[in-house]
Curated annotation (Swiss-Prot):
One of its GO terms (cellular component) is cytosolic small ribosomal subunit. Part of the 30S ribosomal subunit. Forms a bridge to the 50S subunit in the 70S ribosome, contacting the 23S rRNA. SUPFAM superfamilies: S15/NS1 RNA-binding domain (SSF47060). Keywords: Ribonucleoprotein, Ribosomal protein, RNA-binding, rRNA-binding. This is Small ribosomal subunit protein uS15. The keyword Translocase does not apply. Belongs to the universal ribosomal protein uS15 family. One of its GO terms (biological process) is translation. InterPro entries: Ribosomal_uS15, Ribosomal_uS15_bac-type, uS15_NS1_RNA-bd_sf. One of its GO terms (molecular function) is rRNA binding. PROSITE patterns: RIBOSOMAL_S15. The lineage of its organism: Bacteria, Pseudomonadati, Pseudomonadota, Gammaproteobacteria, Alteromonadales. SMART domains: Ribosomal_S15. One of the primary rRNA binding proteins, it binds directly to 16S rRNA where it helps nucleate assembly of the platform of the 30S subunit by binding and bridging several RNA helices of the 16S rRNA. Forms an intersubunit bridge (bridge B4) with the 23S rRNA of the 50S subunit in the ribosome.
Amino acid sequence: MSLTKAETAKIIAEYGVKEGDTGSPEVQVALLTHNINKLQGHFADHKKDHHSRRGLLRMVSQRRKLLDYLKGKNAERYLDLIKRLGLRR
């Protein structure tokens, strides 16, 4: 269920603030969102996979924390990111 190197590089290039940027909140949220979307497809087939569901909830929580941090630091970047990712809120 993890991302390939090509997928990761594509997301980093699209959401990175500068070249080789892997630590900015935008990149981290985009990577988590991609992983979350992949796992949601997994749960359509495997409804009783509770172990993986715990990992999904952990990722959702981490994404929420990063979004809250970004909203507090720079609301404009936050609004741009949630619009680009198609997230609610």
